[in-house]
Each structure stands twice: as C-alpha cells, then as structure tokens.
Amino acid sequence: MYPSVLIAIDREDEPGSQLLAARCRAFLAMGAMGLHLVHVRTPLPRSYLAELPDHWEANDRSEVEGWLRDFAKRHSLDENVIDTHAPSGSVAGDVIRLANELRGDVIYATAHRLDLVRLLLGSNIHAIARDARCDVVVVRE
C-alpha cells in the first residue's frame, strides 16, 4: 500500500496524537510500512537563542526525538519506525520538505476543528494537503 509513511505528530495535541497512533496501527495491520515520525519544533527568536546555553538547540532536538521514540513504543509502532525527525521551523514547510527528501509515499496528520482564526489564516494541514507531492491522509475523530 504505502511503503514509506511520514507521520506528522503535534506533541501539544495528545488526543490527536493518540488518534493518529490508533489509525496508524490499523493501517499497519494491512501491510508493512516504514514509519518516519516528525514533530516540527517552534523556532525561537534569535534574541532568545543568544541567552540560551550553547547546545540548547541540539539538546532540544534530541529531547523531542526521544519523545517521538517513546511515543512509538507506547503505541506499539516502534517496530516499524525507521527514523525520528525534529526540525525547527514551519510546520507545513518542514513536513513537506521531509516527505520529499525521504521520498515518502504518504503523510498522515491530524486536523484540528476549524475555528475562525484558522478559517481566515489557513491551517498547517490545509497547506500540507495543498502542496505535498505525495498522498495526504487527514485523520479526524
């Protein structure tokens, strides 16, 4: 079906992440897939970075990648995980960039309910679905 899957996880959205894991397990039951887990970290302003310890960025990335590995283990996805990724930047831009670099066949992501701000400004999932070269599976309740 989809041999290479990029799973975009929002660490701040625990219910959405659990739902995404459940759907991934269901898809795994249909056949083997290699999973790449990604959480895009919010970049800090340069003025903040100047005040942080030298290795803060590397430590933050390492901590998030550890969280992704723990997430995979907690949700019985770890046997299929190829790698974890924790870039810092634009959610939609970095998810699409990773999918292209990894030659992903599909991106799985959750969609938050639409509110007025997202309606006016757009959402990450909308940008991913619009701009990705591969299939995008949007998981909802």
Residue ranges and their predicted role:
Residues 54-66:
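A short acidic, glycine-rich active-site loop
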Residues 36-38, 83-87, 137:
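General small-molecule cofactor/ligand-binding pocket signal
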Residues 131-141:
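Short, flexible loop segments at boundaries between secondary-structure elements
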Residues 109-131:
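Glycine-rich, Arg-bearing micro-motifs that act as flexible, cationic patches
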Residues 39, 110-112, 140-141:
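Short secondary-structure boundary segments
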Residues 1-51:
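Small/aliphatic-rich secondary-structure junction motif
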Residues 1, 73-107, 114, 126:
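Structural beta-alpha unit
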